[in-house]
Amino acid sequence: MKVLWAALLVTFLAGCQAKVEQVVETEPEPELRQQAEWQSGQRWELALGRFWDYLRWVQTLSEQVQEELLSSQVTQELTALMDETMKELKAYKSELEEQLTPVAEETRARLSKELQAAQARLGADMEDVRGRLVQYRGEVQAMLGQSTEELRARLASHLRKLRKRLLRDADDLQKRLAVYQAGAREGAERGVSAIRERLGPLVEQGRVRAATVGSVAGKPLQERAQAWGERLRARMEEMGSRTRDRLDEVKEQVAEVRAKLEEQAQQIRLQAEAFQARLKSWFEPLVEDMQRQWAGLVEKVQAAVGTSAAPVPSDNH
């Protein structure tokens, strides 16, 4: 009987231990859980997740990492990821600040100050990571081909510490942003309440006006239709009279413009004919004179040519 109880006890304890181990194995690490939140959160969290992934790759200190650490490739990548994270964070903070408008000025200033401090700590953490990698590159280059095993070990230790601090400050920033967002939501609800209070009297006035219109609608439909028809007929007659008057005015204006244009055209025609006659009187004497001079010149040339072509008398007899 004791052996049976002992066997049952051992089986029970083994089962409990298996359950505990299963729970421990299924529960994600804080860093992995935080990274999962970054991958499905706001845009600044996604950018921070990319920075975090790149830092994890750098921590492997593989041969490719060590080669790129000796150049400026790693620091350039980290700088780009840092700038992207801070840019998205600033944009998200500005968006929340716009939503905090209905909140009291004192509360908004306090939340903004706390959030700005948390944002500065996160930026300083990322800057420390980049600075440590720059320092490592300088130390390796100063070794001049010697063993850098100790330098790599120290770098790995520092990166682990920096990663923990970065995780802590990022978590703190997320919490403060959650408070900031809650304040913005509360301010928005207050703003909606204020709008409802302002719109309440207007809605009541609209309801009263609708009731008045409903009472008027109780009149006989034929009577109201007749009144509307008379008003419409009078309005159409008035518009027709105005249109006819306007057409008459337009016709008169068109006739007047046409007469002026014809008169101006006649004046231009007369001026052109007079100018043509004047030009003709100017140039005809000149042309005739040039013709006379040309005729005289031709005669002189012909006479000269005839004289030179006459036969010269011979002296041989």
Swiss-Prot record:
This is Apolipoprotein E. Belongs to the apolipoprotein A1/A4/E family. Residues 158-168 are annotated as: LDL and other lipoprotein receptors binding. Residues 266-317 are annotated as: Homooligomerization. APOE exists as multiple glycosylated and sialylated glycoforms within cells and in plasma. The extent of glycosylation and sialylation are tissue and context specific. APOE is an apolipoprotein, a protein associating with lipid particles, that mainly functions in lipoprotein-mediated lipid transport between organs via the plasma and interstitial fluids. APOE is a core component of plasma lipoproteins and is involved in their production, conversion and clearance. Apolipoproteins are amphipathic molecules that interact both with lipids of the lipoprotein particle core and the aqueous environment of the plasma. One of its GO terms (molecular function) is phosphatidylcholine-sterol O-acyltransferase activator activity. Keywords: Chylomicron, Endosome, Extracellular matrix, Glycoprotein, HDL, Heparin-binding, Lipid transport, Lipid-binding, Oxidation, Phosphoprotein, Repeat, Secreted, Signal, Transport, VLDL. InterPro entries: ApoA_E (IPR000074), Apolipoprotein_A1/A4/E (IPR050163). The gene is APOE. Residues 210-290 are annotated as: Lipid-binding and lipoprotein association. Residues 1-18 form the signal peptide. Homotetramer. May interact with ABCA1; functionally associated with ABCA1 in the biogenesis of HDLs. May interact with APP/A4 amyloid-beta peptide; the interaction is extremely stable in vitro but its physiological significance is unclear. May interact with MAPT. May interact with MAP2. In the cerebrospinal fluid, interacts with secreted SORL1. Interacts with PMEL; this allows the loading of PMEL luminal fragment on ILVs to induce fibril nucleation. PANTHER family: APOLIPOPROTEIN (PTHR18976), APOLIPOPROTEIN E (PTHR18976:SF2). One of its GO terms (biological process) is high-density lipoprotein particle assembly. It comes from the Eukaryota. Residues 278-290 are annotated as: Specificity for association with VLDL. The modification Methionine sulfoxide is found at residue 143. The modification Phosphoserine is found at residue 147.
